[in-house]
Amino acid sequence: MLTKLNHVLLAGVVALACSSCQTEKKADYQVIPLPQEVVLTQEKPFLLNKNVSITYPEGNLLLKRNAEFLSGYIRQATGYTPPVKGLKDGETAKHAINLGLDADIANKEGYVLTTTSEGILINGQTENGVFYGCQTLRKSIPAEAQGADILLPAGSIKDEPRFTYRGMHLDVCRHFFPLEFIKEYIDLLALHNMNTFHWHLTDDQGWR
């Protein structure tokens, strides 16, 4: 009887330990497409949890939209929704993901993603560049992390597209697709940093 009780207690301890292990998951910057430069440091990682907010310069509606996109992506993966806040000039936010513009970044679609234990900064020359930085951050988060805190390694990521035109073709003239599929298709293009949706809408097989 005592042996059975010991087995039950041991199983409970193991289950509890495994459960606690699942409360934190580590992000991975090995994403597709792979950024041009990823430099990690030995500093403490940034902890992405339900207390994190996403900020953008107040008045910039495109960056606000990027922030809302990123908040939605994080909600899909973790189950919690980071609040989105606009910051006035000179304002700062602690333990936040901050979106901004940096004219010193050479490429119009380039971005720099910097991670410290205090926060994450995603800068781009344009709002498009910031969007691609958000996509890289999104892809680094485990796809299934419901209720978990995410550890994002400290360091910096610098990236810019190799090709100006990056797109995919979809022929809906010969092969019909429902509207929801097309929306999902466009989302997948954005996920992989493509910037052109080649939509083949009409055709005339009898044209000479």
Q: Which residues make up each language-model segment?
A:
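Contiguous, structured surface segment used for ligand recognition
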Residues: 21-165
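Glycine-rich, histidine-containing beta strand-loop boundary motifs that form or position
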Residues: 124, 172, 180-181, 198-203
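An acidic-aromatic substrate-binding cleft motif
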Residues: 155-177, 181-184, 190-192
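Aromatic-lined carbohydrate-binding/catalytic grooves of carbohydrate-active enzymes
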Residues: 192-208
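Bacterial Sec-dependent N-terminal signal peptides
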Residues: 1-30
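Flexible loop/turn segments at secondary-structure boundaries
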Residues: 62-63, 176-178, 204-208
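Short secondary-structure capping/junction motifs at helix and strand boundaries
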Residues: 4, 144-148, 194-199
